[in-house]
Amino acid sequence: MAAAQPKKIRMVAGLGNPGDEYARTRHNAGFCAIDELARQANVTYWKNQSGAEVASINVNDPDAEGGKREVLLVKPQSYMNTSGGPISKLCAANRISAEELLVIHDELDIPAGDVRIKVGGGHAGHNGLRLIIDKLGSRDFSRIRVGIGEPPGRMQVADFVLKQLRAKEAEEFDDAAFRAAEAAALALTRGVIFARDHVNGGASGNGKH
């Protein structure tokens, strides 16, 4: 028996930290992917709502009224570890369930530059995900995981994820953020399961599994 298809995505939230000092750091992979997704969708207006920057896009959906489904793009402005607050408030205000939420975040346990999709699951030590799970009371949301690799040598994790990227690192990071945005767009139009199988199967990215 085939697994049930998750509900269609109505919100894509990218995790990161607000402020220019964090803009070019690994921890802001989610923000960068959301910015790229917004650029591809020609978003020109963001509003401040429930402690987050929020934009709205329409995606093709034959099952929706008028053939379009509204999707919210969200960048919480409460810093990474407390992102669950704004996200849960926006979900409640818009009657969006955990299954209709897609979160884009950095992932230490995946090689730098890799992009993978996961449906549900735990937080794996990621404090941003930890509070989202706590606030929603559910682990059923989908995730796009942007690999950043592990810290070199004895470098602390906090220093690694908040360190400004060097030129070559930034190029790889930007490419991964672009592919994460493409993965999100695919999930919006074709469904999370299709996008997961396509992306994780090596059809997108650098071929690492």
Predicted regions and their residues:
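Short glycine-enriched, charge-decorated loop/helix-capping segments at active-site entrances
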Residues: 116-122, 161-165
